[in-house]
Regions:
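Phosphate-end processing signature that detects enzymes handling 5′-triphosphorylated RNA
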Residues: 2-331
């Protein structure tokens, strides 16, 4: 007659295995689609992405001093070590924070943002005073790369402008451990390039002026004389600190920074962000190994910074939602 074998005693500590903190989405390395050949109305070829930008949107409550920005750097030391990413703060500890004033303008029904456009003005400050010219930033941000590239954001101005086309990597909206991609087709230029009293002075701006400067916005115009207003009646103060350099190997290095947005005057903290980006000329020359390290580091950092992260948010969306009635963005 067979003898029954008593089951081995189990430890309460071993009853629930610790889940592995791995990626929950397929790797995006090598999966960003190639653009189909196309051209703008003037015959110029469509723009191609030249930046990869990784962003974590953060709760702002842990950032209350310049030193607290560097405290966030301690959070990703382990993810960096795990994936062979070098992180150094040499030369950054002494650098001051950077201050910018940022405001957004839109129609009363958020027609720009609902159609994936963002229009803002920003002014840098130093020692409490504005420096340089106010800058206009106009962008089309969307998850469809081809649509983003074919949207001609170039302004109709006499002065020069600069285009920045970015692949933006963000966490998933609903859980940690994944990556979703947005494509941001930007143009920026000094306000003086379009004359005095246009964009950035929200009470002087209407849709007609906006369409003259940005012809692509004719698609959102309903009628002449429509007014543009300051979004959420709020002017933002951005406080940004470069905290170090990340080295992913194979020549792929970039600055890392932490920033918070708060309301001007009340200094009410709204949202934070950790970001790093690098520029490239030819995507085929980017090291796949370095990109995989970038991705693995970004995934691990999400888990390490769990107490900081604000899933499903962007800085712009936070401003638009300040007074309720959130728009239907494409983000």
């Amino acid at each position: 007659m067979p003898t029954a074998t008593a089951p081995a005693p189990s430890s309460p500590k071993d009853s629930k295995p610790v889940p592995k903190k791995e990626a929950v989405t397929p790797s995006w390395v090598g999966r960003v689609p190639q653009l189909k050949p196309a051209q703008y109305a003037d015959g110029m070829p469509i723009h191609k992405p030249e930046y990869i930008c990784c962003k974590l949107i953060l709760r702002p409550n842990k950032f209350h001093s310049r030193e607290s920005f560097f405290d966030f750097g301690k959070v990703f030391k382990e993810p960096a070590k795990e994936h062979g990413v070098k992180y150094t703060t040499e030369g950054f500890i002494e650098q001051p924070v950077k201050i910018r004033e940022v405001l957004f303008v839109d129609t009363a029904d958020f027609r720009l943002y609902n159609n994936a456009f963002i229009l803002r003005r920003r002014i840098p400050y130093k020692d409490g005073f504005p420096i340089g010219e106010p800058e206009i930033v106009f962008k089309f941000r969307h998850p469809d790369l081809q649509m983003c590239a074919e949207t001609d954001v170039r302004p109709n101005i006499l002065g020069d402008h600069r285009v920045k086309f970015k692949v933006q990597a963000l966490p998933l909206k609903e859980k940690l451990g994944g990556i979703r991609l947005l494509y941001s087709h930007n143009v920026q230029f000094p306000r003086s390039a379009i004359g005095i009293g246009a964009i950035g002075q929200e009470n002087a701006l209407d849709v007609d002026t906006m369409v003259r400067v940005f012809p692509v916005l004719a698609r959102v115009k309903k009628q002449s004389g429509e007014k543009i207003k300051l979004v959420s009646d709020t002017i933002i103060e951005e406080v940004l600190q470069d905290i170090g350099v990340l080295d992913f190997g194979d020549g792929l290095t970039c600055k890392a920074n932490v920033a918070i947005w708060r309301t001007r005057g009340e200094h009410r903290p709204l949202i934070g962000e950790f970001a790093y980006q690098f520029r490239f000329k030819d995507r085929e020359k980017l090291s796949k190994d370095a990109l995989r390290r970038t991705e693995a580091f970004f995934i691990s950092l999400q888990y390490a910074a769990e107490d900081y992260i604000n899933l499903g948010a962007t800085k712009t969306a936070t401003v638009y939602r300040l007074l309720g009635n959130p728009p239907n963005s494409q983000e």
